[in-house]
């Protein structure tokens, strides 16, 4: 493969070959906030062009870019644009709109309105109408981050564990139920608001490493594990130099 897509998130690194206008088979692993295992970097593919999106710390981003520059003839780093591939961003200053959210919207663009919920370190929610106009969104802590924050302030509260219940009868279950339920409630409220605003049903797309536990609570949701990489593929196709 001559062109590859790289998505460097806050806690996970994903990459895939560019397969036409979509991402091919995805590989992924977790990384620390400021570092990535040397063996992982040495295992990166090589080719003609690397298309890179990063929301990770600057030091880690630069280390990954330096490694990619030894493996690819060209390394292209995506930045959020006011408009791309039929999507128009609502932010007055597009540079303040996260590149992961931007690419998720490119990946979600279709012929029907959509709400995109990304569940990672943060929970992000964005609404896109059928004409590609972004109507804004929300940012909150993801369930994982909520649990970690509670544990940091009250160490007796475990950072993991428990199962969802509408009314839990032990602490672990209550924590999972509260944090997962808060995320689901925000998504559902946003979906209802989007449908009222646009005057029609709105499709729900969910992505991110923290999304699977929420899917049983969101019966209309479609899970798109590679949504950001698919958006990066769209960006790569539409922004390629002539």
Curated annotation (Swiss-Prot):
What is this protein called in UniProt? Answer: Type III pantothenate kinase
User: Which Pfam family is one of those matched by this entry?
Assistant: Pan_kinase
What EC numbers are recorded for this enzyme?
2.7.1.33
What pathway is it annotated to?
Cofactor biosynthesis; coenzyme A biosynthesis; CoA from (R)-pantothenate: step 1/5
Q: How, per the record, is the cofactor bound? A: A monovalent cation. Ammonium or potassium.
Q: Where is the active site?
A: 100
Residue positions binding substrate:
91, 98-101, 171
Q: What is its subcellular localisation?
A: Cytoplasm
> What is one cellular component GO term in this UniProt entry?
cytoplasm
Q: Where does ATP bind?
A: 7-14, 121
In terms of SUPFAM superfamilies, this protein maps to: Actin-like ATPase domain
């Amino acid at each position: 493969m001559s062109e590859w897509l790289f998505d460097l998130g806050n806690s996970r690194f994903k990459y895939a070959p560019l397969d036409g206008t979509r991402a091919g088979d995805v590989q992924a692993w977790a990384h620390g906030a400021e570092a990535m295992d040397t063996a992982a970097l040495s295992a990166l593919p090589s080719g003609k062009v690397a298309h890179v999106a990063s929301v990770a710390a600057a030091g880690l981003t630069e280390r990954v870019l330096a490694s990619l520059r030894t493996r690819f003839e060209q390394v292209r780093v995506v930045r959020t644009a006011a408009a791309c591939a039929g999507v128009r961003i609502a932010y007055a200053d597009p540079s303040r709109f996260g590149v992961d959210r931007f690419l998720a919207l490119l990946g979600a663009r279709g012929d029907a309105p959509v709400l995109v919920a990304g569940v990672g370190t943060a929970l992000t929610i964005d609404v896109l109408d059928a004409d590609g106009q972004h109507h804004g969104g929300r940012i909150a802590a993801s369930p994982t981050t909520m649990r970690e924050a509670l544990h940091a302030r009250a160490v007796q509260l475990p950072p993991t564990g428990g199962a969802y219940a509408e009314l839990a009868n032990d602490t672990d279950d209550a924590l999972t139920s509260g944090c997962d339920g808060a995320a689901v409630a925000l998504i559902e409220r946003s979906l209802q608001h989007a449908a009222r605003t646009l005057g029609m049903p709105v499709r729900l797309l969910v992505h991110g490493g923290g999304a699977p536990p929420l899917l049983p609570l969101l019966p209309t949701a479609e899970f798109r594990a590679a949504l950001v990489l698919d958006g990066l593929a769209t960006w790569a196709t539409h922004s390629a130099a002539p």
